[in-house]
Amino acid sequence: MTKAWEKNIRKVVPYVPGEQPNKERMIKLNTNENPYPPAPGVAEALKNLDPDRLRLYPDPACIRLVNAIAKQKGLKSEQVFVGVGSDDVLAMCFMTFFNSDKPVLFPDISYSFYSVWADLYRIPYETPALNDKFEIVPEDYFKENGGVIFPNPNAPTALHMDLEKVEEIIRHNQDVVVIVDEAYIDFDGRSARELVHKYDNLLVVQTFSKSRSMAGMRIGYAFGNKDLIKALNDVKFSFNSYTMNAPTLAYGVAAVEDDAYFKECVEKIKNKIGRASCRERV
């Protein structure tokens, strides 16, 4: 058999997911999972799920979950897109928005999946270096490019960029899409959510995996200008209409609706992080 297909993937170095050891009584830190269980409403939704519903295809538009997220974020439903974890959403973003001959810009020390997607989709990219304090330098993103993406807070440095600096990057790149990856925003920093009404080129991506304790459910979402969301849906419906299964959609709605529990768990984690930081300094 000829292997003509190899030329499409032979240069790709795949992302290495975190190990999931099958051992009891282990403190697992390698993939930053939440130590607290999901909201009680999620367990209730699991208990009340009608098995007969599983014979039907799930809602391809994920309307109930989209509406719940939009309401919680103070947005319109047409401004929200959901996917199978933020990795799925981000991969679709690379496919949808980063298709010019100009390089996409993202930090040299950052989420390692960015370069994997760029290589897989043959997207040129450049990786501006962090400064000597491991901070993103906004001015490095003012040059001509085919799009910008960065995490805030950054991973793995855990440093967040002030919203004013985030806006500087967006303001200097209004001809391309700027994606702010906010997987950890609930633990530190200000979300760029308040800027989506001001800039139609801004897309913010978040996840249920960290602050909402649902890494096993795989729910991620993006919000921004309705035209960006429509473009993402056009790509999604071009290859897989049913990306999210019915149980996951139900659990996601239950998680969003229990905002008090979510905030309580986030505060507990932030307090523990603060105590750990104090011990390090001592």
Predicted regions and their residues:
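Phosphate-binding glycine-rich loop
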Residues: I63-P103
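Short glycine-rich anion-binding loops that position phosphate/pyrophosphate groups of nucleotides
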Residues: N32-P35, S86-D87, Y111, N152-P156, ...
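PLP-dependent aminotransferase-like
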Residues: T96-P151
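N-terminal "arm"/small-domain region of PLP-dependent enzymes with the aminotransferase-like
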Residues: M1-L56, E144
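PLP-dependent aminotransferase class I/II
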Residues: N201-S277
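Positively charged, low-complexity/disordered segments
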Residues: E280-V282
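Active-site pre-lysine segment of PLP-dependent enzymes
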Residues: K133-E144, P156-V178, E182-M214
